Curated annotation (Swiss-Prot):
Record's compositionally biased regions (Polar residues): 601-611
Classification lineage: Eukaryota, Fungi, Dikarya, Ascomycota, Pezizomycotina
The keyword Endoplasmic reticulum appears for this protein: yes
Name by which UniProt lists this protein: Nuclear protein localization protein 4
MF terms (GO), sorted A to Z: ubiquitin binding; ubiquitin protein ligase binding
Gene that this sequence comes from: NPL4
GO biological process terms, semicolon-separated: mRNA transport; protein transport; ubiquitin-dependent protein catabolic process
Domain MPN intervals: 270-418
Alphabetized UniProt keyword annotations: Cytoplasm, Endoplasmic reticulum, Membrane, mRNA transport, Nucleus, Protein transport, Translocation, Transport
Length: 642
């Protein structure tokens, strides 16, 4: 076999372009000496990376040292192909002083300057923090991203709206079809106007933009139709200038923002499984006069009232540690958040939103920022987006007074543009609840991470003459451009998962309500009646309290949550017969079920409780060491009395 003919490869770096003659059978690490000859003298060899696209633009970047055993012909490179090179420069230190290359000395003499002409201090030259930079793209998200089962189900649906025969316009038989009776697309404007649907559902919007982005008749390559708004400075600009805030160009700076009402919503409806969920949250306000916040746990289900719709079904509300105030709440660190999420997962639930009282309504500016921050924490995974995620299904509900003086529920989401503007630190709440402020651009001379780039922001509105005009959003603009309203309600046929929610709610000690073993014993100790236990565990707050005790193992806790959500007698009997449940019952009988006969001070009562077994004349003596269950019961007993 004849040896492979040499080929010419082109290389491009921020220092310029060069060409190398190589053999197709050469391995990439063998090219390192030739590559270094064409790069600056102070280039760090371990930092050299190769890419099929300009560095920082989403290409397949690989360190050249990791390509050992990979030949040029193996990756499909042919004569004339181009590769892009990224590298870092190193500074030699001699006797405690920096020995710089002449080119770097000239750069220090010509210090980088901002757009306004102000020189950048050297200590500012640090990589920007991850927050104000753009998101990374995912190659083939339709293969790499795992969606929720509900999204997969809605993707497989046809979604078209069937119509009957129009007796006025149709001129065909019952088996025919024409333009007046053919099924409509789920985003058909005439159907939305007829049903008074203000926003498209997410999957209807997806069908609409996918039909215009990917046309099968063109036989072109597939392009993900969804792209999240990006208002942050791009990292690793291919132009080769210093990173922001030292430098910026048209390739890495975000474009101007034009705000418009979002035509779709990620979730269409919020359904509370029972009015008791709302009443229990309002009870705190009635008893304390302060506001309250809770996180919603439930599921996402198909909402049939709108084409391809999604609804959030709330089954429980968990109130994290907080301090209520007359006009708001202050959240404390939620130490057991992961444990509560795990209990919810065992019950088939997830965190789907937040609800808070706002009975002294001061406006919506700070609430929108709060909602946007939470939605940014819980993004929606989708294979239809180039970043693998798009928007969020997290909802926000507010309990406030209406015009008639009654308490009403408002459900909304922050728009995708609002979430991105909060992440990019572009907007902030104002003293006027009806408007949002655009922040001032900041060039920090003390900390590069505090530098803030603010693009131009506009919004469109209909003026007094009926014309659609564009207005400058600086210094402020109406908050309506950042909101998407949702519908809400209660089911006509309630299907309540936790049908025995009488256990005290967590973190309510300030109004005299606390969770303890005695309350737990009243609900769970059955005295031979297993149905009491099976019914008693159907309480989300009780499940979280049991999780905090750490008595049951994970398998027993999963079985407990199964009984709580399914109310199945067979599973309940299996739970009662587990060793962990026997330990729990022993603890409750020893510590929580029987109140003390005398009212002792706490310290002396604890002392007597911990020693009376050994000193009581009628106490039975065991010849064997005490079991772990008995020892654990005594420890709980001594700690819980009082």
């Amino acid at each position: 076999m004849a040896p492979a003919r040499p080929i010419l490869l082109r290389f491009e770096s921020r220092n310029g372009q060069f060409r190398l003659t190589v053999n197709p059978t050469d391995e990439f690490p063998s090219l390192l000496p030739k590559v270094l000859d064409n790069l600056p003298k102070n280039t760090a060899p371990p930092s050299i990376v190769l890419s099929n696209k300009p560095i920082g633009t989403g290409g397949q970047e690989r360190n050249i040292s990791t390509l050992k055993g990979v030949t040029i012909q193996r990756v499909g490179l042919s004569h004339g192909d181009k590769l892009f090179i990224g590298y870092e420069e190193e500074t030699a230190v001699v006797n405690g002083s920096s020995s710089e290359h002449p080119s770097s000395i000239s750069k220090s003499q010509n210090a980088p300057r901002r757009l306004d002409g102000v020189a950048v201090r050297q200590q500012e030259q640090a990589p920007p923090v991850p927050t104000p930079t753009s998101e990374t793209l995912i190659k083939n998200p339709w293969e790499a991203v795992k969606q929720s089962p509900l999204d997969d189900r809605l993707d497989r649906k046809d979604g078209k709206i069937s119509r009957g025969l129009d007796h006025k316009m149709c001129r065909h038989g019952p088996k025919g079809m024409c333009d007046y009776c053919m099924p409509l697309e789920p985003y058909a404007p005439e159907y939305l106007a007829e049903k008074k649907i203000k926003h498209l559902s997410f999957h209807s919007y997806l069908r609409k933009i996918n039909s215009s982005t990917n046309k099968p008749e063109l036989k072109s390559s597939y392009i993900p139709p969804l792209s999240e708004p990006d208002y942050r400075v791009k990292r690793d600009c291919p132009s080769g200038h210093p990173a922001w805030p030292e430098g910026i160009c048209t390739k890495c700076q975000p474009s101007a923002i034009t705000l418009q009402p979002q035509p779709f919503r990620m979730v269409d409806h919020v359904e509370f499984s029972s009015p008791d969920l709302i009443n229990s949250l309002l009870d705190f306000w009635r008893k304390s006069g302060t506001q309250r916040l809770g996180f919603l746990y439930g599921t996402y289900e198909e909402y049939t009232e709108v084409p391809l719709g999604i609804k959030a079904v709330v089954q429980a509300i968990y109130e994290p540690p907080q301090v209520g105030e007359v006009d708001g709440v202050t959240l404390h660190e939620w130490g057991n958040e992961k444990d509560v999420d795990e209990v919810a997962k065992f019950c088939g639930l997830e965190k789907i939103g937040v609800i808070f009282t706002d009975l002294l309504d001061a406006g919506a500016g700070d609430e929108i920022v709060f909602a946007a921050q939470l939605q940014a924490r819980y993004p929606k995974a989708t294979k239809w987006s180039e970043t693998g995620r798009f928007g969020s299904n997290f909802v926000t509900c507010v309990l406030s007074g209406d015009e008639d003086g009654a308490i009403s529920i408002s459900a909304y989401q922050a728009s995708n543009s609002a979430v991105e503007m909060v992440k990019a630190d572009i907007i902030e709440p104002s003293a006027d609840p009806g408007v949002m402020l655009v922040q001032q651009e900041n060039h920090s001379d003390d900390d590069a991470s505090k530098a803030r780039y603010i693009p131009e922001v506009f919004y469109r509105k209909v003026n007094e003459y009926g014309a659609n005009v564009q207005e400058n959003a600086k210094p402020s603009f109406p908050v309506e451009y950042l909101l998407v309203t949702l519908t809400h309600g209660f089911p006509t046929d309630p299907d309540v998962m936790f049908n025995n929610s009488t256990f005290p709610i967590e973190n309510r000690e300030v109004i005299g309500e606390s969770q303890d073993l005695r309350m737990l014993a009243d609900k769970l100790v059955s005295h031979g009646d297993p149905n009491k236990t099976i019914c008693g565990v159907s309480d989300f707050h009780l499940l979280c309290f049991l999780n905090s005790l750490g008595i049951l193992n994970k398998d027993e806790e999963f079985l407990l949550c199964t009984v709580a959500r399914s109310h199945d007698t067979a599973d309940g009997m299996q739970l009662i017969n587990t060793s962990g449940w026997a330990t729990l019952v022993t603890i409750l009988q020893e510590s929580g079920e029987r109140p003390p006969k005398r009212s002792w001070p706490f310290q002396s009562q604890t002392f007597i409780s911990s020693h009376q077994r050994s000193k009581h004349p009628q106490a039975p003596k065991s010849e064997h060491p005490q079991s772990d269950s008995e020892q654990l019961a005594k420890r709980f007993k001594g700690a819980s009395l009082g």
